[in-house]
Amino acid sequence: MEDIKIKGTPKTPTVNFIKGEGKLEIKGRSIPENSIEFYKPLIDWIEHYSSSPADKTHVNIQLEYFNTSSSKCILDVFKKLEAVDGDVIVNWYYEEDDEDMLEAGEDYEAIINIPFKMIEVEEI
């Protein structure tokens, strides 16, 4: 199973999924032309990863902005992560004073049965 490394663009986030480290990172802006097309390989990767995950899986989400269609796809990512055996923790980063992004993380946390850690940072 190959790691996923996608360089971010002004419309798509940087993605680093590293199986051996149990590290999944999504950061930047998520406003792709077709969210389903962008996120499907990530969701498929997590499905394969869940069959033999690392003991601990750290998911780092550092999004400065995402649109509505990305929101649904991000939820699908989290739903796939629920099936991962072992410890999974989501670190949800948000910029100070960005109440909308904090609330988005809290909304996902309320829906998904995975512990979230809300981390305020100066800048994403």
Region annotations inferred by a language model:
Residues 12-15, 31-56:
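A short, well-ordered alpha-helical element
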Residues 42, 58-108:
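Amphipathic alpha-helical interaction surfaces in cytosolic regulatory modules
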Residues 16, 25, 60-62:
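Extracellular beta-strand solenoid repeats
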Residues 22-28:
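Short, aliphatic-rich beta-strand segments
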Residues 54, 84-88, 111-118:
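Structural alpha-beta junctions
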Residues 93, 116-124:
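A generic structural motif
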Residues 1-15:
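N-terminal amphipathic/basic leader segments beginning at the initiator methionine
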